[in-house]
């Protein structure tokens, strides 16, 4: 810490504190997205994506037996939402000073310190109760990848856009994968298809 060279500036405005709060909000925004992505990727097991398997921290849903609720994702996203609200309050407080005096520092300080504490606790719980126990679901990932119609894009250089679109439409209409649709239409044999769509080399 050091003494300011311009006391009037710091009494009239708390820009630096507002900047600190904005950085906390940016972190909260990133964590909010991460928690929502995990929640979507772990949805299932039959009607969702189910490419991630999350720990079962609670007995399950009180309504649906056997259901695994993404409680840690929900908890973290609620904390992040609260912090976004705190940041908005800080920005209003920082803009609300009167001439050479901003009397909103107690609100600003409270929101910053509370946000740090809330986010720190939420991150710790998220790591211990979800991240360390999360697992990939290779079987479902492979199934979803093989059934993805978007892979048809890789066939365009070989057979052209129109034929590739025809393959995608047939695969969708008959609930078959792209390889089966391609062979059925006679545009490529199995070996040529595997050479064109090699998912191991697409990343």
Question: In which residue ranges do the predicted regions lie?
Answer:
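Conserved, well-structured ligand/cofactor-binding cores
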Residues: 1-203
């Amino acid at each position: 810490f050091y003494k300011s060279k311009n006391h009037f500036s710091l009494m009239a405005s708390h820009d630096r504190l507002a900047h600190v709060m904005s950085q906390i909000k940016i972190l909260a925004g990133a964590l909010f997205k991460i928690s929502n992505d995990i929640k979507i990727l772990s949805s299932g097991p039959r009607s969702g994506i189910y490419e991630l398997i999350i720990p079962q921290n609670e007995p399950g849903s009180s309504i649906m037996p056997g259901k695994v609720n993404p409680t840690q994702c929900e908890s973290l996203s609620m904390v992040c939402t609260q912090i976004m609200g705190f940041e908005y309050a800080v920005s209003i407080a920082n803009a609300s000073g009167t001439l050479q005096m901003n009397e909103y520092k107690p609100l600003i300080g409270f929101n910053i310190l509370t946000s740090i504490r809330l986010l720190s606790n939420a991150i710790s719980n998220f790591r211990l109760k979800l991240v360390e126990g999360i697992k990939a679901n290779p079987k479902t990932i492979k199934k979803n990848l093989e059934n993805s119609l978007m892979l048809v894009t890789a066939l365009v250089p070989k057979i052209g856009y129109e034929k590739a679109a025809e393959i995608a439409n047939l695969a969708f209409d008959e609930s078959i994968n792209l390889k089966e649709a391609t062979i059925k239409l006679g545009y490529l044999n199995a070996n040529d298809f595997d050479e064109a769509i090699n998912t191991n080399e697409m990343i």
